[in-house]
């Protein structure tokens, strides 16, 4: 019987396999035949990923791929020292000329975007800027009047979220401030934008991104009543009570 495993180039790839099995099938069970047959089945220690038919003496040497050089060059262009033009981020906010993320809404004095909710007319610096800084055009980079830091609008994408639209000026109103009806100019917000918070004077203070949100009055009472319904009490029935045979009327025994 010549099966796949009894061939010279069989699965185990041992040269003594065919001769050992052929002699064994003829009835010549001498010591040499037994040794050859045993050696044939001891030679199966080939790795699983290696083919016994491959010529391992003519293996291809390792070569550098032409794509490796292009990948290295691209990485150096982006992350290397020579690629400084690709390193624009929020840490490079100095002026519009070098700011890779130019804020198109909050850069002008009359377009809003001062540190506290609108640049106003840019004539009274610390009155319409909201951050008590004389530079109305750079208000988004100045700290608030109350010592509270204000996020740069270039790193604040929520200042351009749809829905916060100033219908009078046509520009989105930032979360930092601006009157809900006046669009963050000096007077339409209700009061001049030089409040103690320095974030959003007048009506805009409630919509500031870092304003403290508290619930009081009827809303607080309604919230407390709703939360009390979820508090566990003596009448609460848990699934383990049914498993243990507890009664819902008297869960504590």
From Swiss-Prot:
Residues 125-193 are annotated as: Disordered. Residues 125-141 have a biased composition (Low complexity). A motif (Antp-type hexapeptide) lies at residues 237-242. GO terms for cellular component: nucleus. It is found in: Nucleus. It comes from the Eukaryota. Keywords: Activator, Developmental protein, DNA-binding, Homeobox, Nucleus, Transcription, Transcription regulation. Residues 176-189 have a biased composition (Gly residues). Belongs to the Antp homeobox family. Sequence-specific transcription factor which is part of a developmental regulatory system that provides cells with specific positional identities on the anterior-posterior axis. Binds the consensus region 5'-TTAAT[GT][GA]-3'. This homeotic protein controls development of the cells in the posterior thoracic and first abdominal segments. It activates the synthesis of the decapentaplegic (DPP) growth factor. This is Homeotic protein ultrabithorax. It comes from Drosophila funebris. The lineage of its organism: Eukaryota, Metazoa, Ecdysozoa, Arthropoda, Hexapoda.
């Amino acid at each position: 019987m010549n099966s796949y495993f009894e061939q010279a180039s069989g699965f185990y790839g041992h040269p003594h396999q065919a001769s050992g099995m052929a002699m064994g099938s003829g009835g010549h069970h001498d010591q040499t035949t037994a040794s050859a047959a045993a050696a044939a089945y001891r030679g199966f220690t080939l790795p699983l990923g290696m083919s016994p038919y491959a010529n391992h003496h003519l293996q291809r040497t390792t070569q550098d791929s032409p794509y490796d050089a292009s990948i290295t060059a691209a990485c150096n262009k982006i992350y290397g020292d020579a690629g400084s033009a690709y390193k624009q981020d929020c840490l490079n906010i100095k002026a519009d000329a070098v700011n890779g993320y130019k804020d198109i809404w909050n850069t002008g004095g009359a377009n809003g975007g001062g540190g506290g909710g609108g640049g106003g007319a840019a004539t009274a610096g610390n009155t319409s800027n909201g951050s008590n800084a004389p530079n109305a055009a750079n208000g988004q980079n100045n700290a608030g009047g109350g010592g509270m830091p204000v996020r740069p609008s270039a790193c604040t994408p929520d200042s351009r979220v749809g829905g916060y639209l100033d219908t009078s000026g046509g520009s989105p109103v930032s979360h930092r401030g601006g009157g809900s009806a006046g669009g963050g100019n000096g007077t339409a917000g209700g009061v001049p934008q030089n409040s103690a918070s320095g974030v959003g004077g007048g009506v805009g203070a409630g919509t500031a991104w870092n304003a403290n949100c508290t619930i009081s009055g009827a809303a607080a009472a309604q919230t407390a009543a709703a939360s009390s319904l979820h508090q566990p009490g003596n009448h609460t029935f848990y699934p383990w009570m049914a498993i243990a045979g507890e009664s819902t009327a008297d869960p504590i025994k």
